[in-house]
């Protein structure tokens, strides 16, 4: 009989504490302690990156909860791809709307396995006055972004959170992801433009630092790989480190083979399916693929 990875959870549920690791507890974000846990003060001071699950996802929840009750916050724009039925993210957005703030949620109703749940959450938020947008008919809105606009010293100032993982507090305890908090004007302007695009208010404009998929991401990644190939051929330092959910795209795989053959050292961190064959002589001998992070 084949055993799926999910079946292993039944083994873990056995009462054999000596065979198990101690429960892992995410550490608090040290940066916030310097600012009495005031997310906006911390972001205003300097951008910071949070590494989940080693650092707690609570910082993302706190960021939205503080926005929901902050009298200076005038608007929140949020993407929702996958979350929980009792999500504190949803509660924060509805609380913000109840407090009279302009709240927009881009909810993806084509998220696999969560279609029904996302529709129910969208209806719940809409009843509280959250403006709901369902994204594009032919595409999945997979971006993970949150934009908060505050009125400061008579002007509007933007704050942004972007991440590699969903706004899903439970998964964030076991999924390895990165969060960026920033008030950088160029990045904030990019995220504003992307939300305007997703909500149908404007066509996509030229972006400063954010790369949008599908229009531009492939070309950007190819250009970056080409640059490493060029460096390797000139005997300059080169290397590629890529983290992704899966790798099945034939063109991207061919490009990575090309880089490996040119002498570029490549490390791939791939959670799921990987169609690239590492370690093949004269093809992919410079490529290492890792899938599991363990203790």
Describe these PLM feature segments:
Residues 250-253, 257:
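Glycine/threonine-rich ATP-lid/beta-loop region of ATP-binding domains
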Residues 265-269:
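Hydrophobic alpha/beta core scaffold segments
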Residues 1-240, 258-262, 274-295:
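N-terminal localization/anchoring segments of enzymes in phospholipid and broader phosphate metabolism
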Residues 243:
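Short, flexible helix-loop junctions that flank or precede catalytic/ligand sites
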Residues 247-249, 273-276:
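Short, catalytically relevant binding-site loops at active-site mouths
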């Amino acid at each position: 009989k084949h055993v799926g990875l999910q079946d292993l959870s039944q083994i873990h549920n056995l009462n054999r504490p000596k065979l198990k690791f101690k429960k892992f507890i995410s550490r608090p974000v040290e940066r916030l302690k310097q600012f009495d846990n005031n997310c906006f003060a911390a972001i205003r001071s300097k951008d910071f990156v949070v590494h989940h699950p080693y650092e707690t996802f609570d910082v993302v929840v706190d960021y939205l909860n503080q926005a929901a009750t902050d009298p200076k916050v005038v608007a929140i724009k949020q993407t929702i791809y996958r979350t929980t039925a009792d999500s504190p993210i949803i509660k924060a957005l509805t609380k913000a709307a109840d407090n009279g703030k302009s709240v927009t949620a881009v909810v993806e109703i084509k998220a696999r396995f969560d279609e029904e749940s996302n529709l129910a959450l969208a209806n719940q938020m809409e009843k509280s006055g959250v403006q709901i947008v369902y994204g594009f008919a032919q595409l999945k809105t997979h971006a993970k972004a949150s934009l908060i606009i505050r009125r400061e010293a008579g002007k509007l100032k933007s704050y942004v959170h972007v991440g590699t993982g969903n706004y899903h507090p439970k998964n964030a305890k076991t999924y390895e992801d990165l969060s960026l908090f920033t008030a950088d004007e160029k990045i904030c302007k990019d995220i504003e433009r992307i939300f305007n695009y997703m909500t149908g208010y404007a066509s996509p404009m030229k972006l400063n630092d954010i790369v949008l998929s599908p229009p531009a991401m492939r070309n950007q990644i190819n250009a970056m790989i080409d640059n490493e190939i060029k460096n390797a051929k000139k005997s300059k330092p080169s290397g590629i480190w890529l983290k992704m959910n899966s790798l099945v795209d034939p063109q991207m795989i061919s490009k990575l083979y090309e880089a490996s053959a040119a002498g570029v050292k490549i490390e791939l961190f791939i959670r799921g399916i990987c169609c690239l064959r590492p370690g093949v002589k004269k093809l992919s001998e410079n490529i290492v693929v890792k899938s599991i992070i363990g203790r």
